[in-house]
């Protein structure tokens, strides 16, 4: 009998922000998939979950290429999929750890799409997204009343960024490290700097 595949959001970095359901799934798993990039040793998601790991847990590191287009390196993704399916076919429950929430700008989304047509039981467990944690961290409401809220990837086209930020009452711009100077300039040109907050590694 095949095992169950769990996608677990470990939140923004503080192990105490994991949900009770996430902790129970981690404790019950036979195997943990710890995603990492080619350029870095170890897995940030794994380190966040480490306080809840049982001693005999099997840990499998998988490298996920940081590419804009999934098709650019589909071979690596297919290899990871095959490894996960092999573990599930052994009857093992496999938990895939991911930062923040599994269904929000997450590597897990691609893994989920690869497995959802493979007759696999999939359980996705939500986590706290970084921008939600930031509101509490800096003591600023993210959105209130009838405000319109937008989430924008920092990699979006500059004109698109400006267009969305002009109509949103509040916005979270994610992953700004590639073009932070352009985004700060945009905020200045639109007189938004007084209300803006720049946060790095919010939960770490």
Feature map (PLM): residue ranges:
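Class I S-adenosyl-L-methionine
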Residues: 1-15, 20-22, 27-121
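Solvent-exposed alpha-helices and their adjacent loops that cap or buttress functional pockets
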Residues: 1-2, 24-25, 88-89, 96, ...
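A contiguous loop/helix-start segment that scaffolds small-molecule binding in enzyme catalytic cores
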Residues: 5, 165-204
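Short beta-strand segments
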Residues: 7-9, 97-99, 152-153, 173-175, ...
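General beta-strand structural signal in soluble alpha/beta enzymes
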Residues: 34, 61, 96-98, 124-127, ...
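Short gly/pro/ser/thr-enriched loop/turn and capping motifs at secondary-structure boundaries
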Residues: 39-42, 67, 129-132, 180, ...
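A short acidic, often aromatic-flanked loop/helix-cap motif at beta-alpha or helix-coil junctions
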Residues: 65-70, 157-159, 204
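Class I SAM-dependent methyltransferase SAM-binding "motif I" and its flanking Rossmann-like core
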Residues: 103-167
